[in-house]
Amino acid sequence: MRIRDRLGISETTQKRAAWLMQVGLVGMLFIGLDRPNLGIVVNAAVGLAVVQLPSLLERDYQIPMDPALTLWISSAVFLHALGTVGIPGSRYSFYETLWWWDHLTHALSASVVAAAGYATVRAVDRHNDRIYLPPRFTFVFVLLITIAFGVFWEVLEFAIAQASALVGSTSVLTQYGLGDTMLDLVFDVVGAVIVATWGTVYLTDVVGALATRLSARAER
């Protein structure tokens, strides 16, 4: 049984929540333009681009996107963008005032990356009969791909922060020190473990669609 079934959350409610998050991202974009704050503008704009992916994948590639998956992706980018805005009228963002906000968004973002890795490796496994990927291998693969992406992201944060300091502009991404980086990676692993353990519940349809597309391409 899925979490939404236990909580009694309908698909309509999930779709509305995802839509409200998109509206919220538009609002954050205008807040960033009004302040003006480059970090808010960039993070809100990237978030708006990402939340279009589920409908794009479903419309152009026939990959079924459950409302829960769409809400999952929307939540990750929405909370990240919201963290750069904070409470209206305040000088400080949630990333600066709430110590756990950065770790929450890292776990959510990592779970989305892990889901993409899980769906891909399971689709390859189902597509080719000559390939057999044991569950343990899939689990480890998802962990490794997520950790690798997490390390890349931390390096990117550091590079952008240093470049912004050199040119004297506002940093789009902020790094808060080595200890924070290590904790971020720990929460990345938490997100990956959740997906690697329970990914079958939510990603079966996506895996099936990807495997079908791989088979269709191989037959051409």
Labelled PLM ranges:
Residues 86-95, 147-189, 193, 197:
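Interfacial helix-loop-helix junctions of multi-pass membrane proteins
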Residues 42-45, 64-76:
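Cytoplasmic-side transmembrane-helix entry/capping segments in multi-pass membrane proteins
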Residues 76-81, 114-118, 145-157:
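Alpha-helical transmembrane segments of multi-pass membrane proteins
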Residues 99-119, 182-190:
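Membrane-interface loop-to-helix entry segments
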Residues 127-147:
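Internal alpha-helical transmembrane segments of multi-pass membrane proteins
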Residues 28-41, 55-62:
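Short, hydrophobic transmembrane alpha-helix segments
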Residues 1-27, 60-65, 130-133, 201-220:
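Haloarchaeal acidic low-complexity proteome signature biased toward cell-envelope/secretome components but also
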Residues 60, 82-93, 104, 120, ...:
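Transmembrane alpha-helix boundary signature
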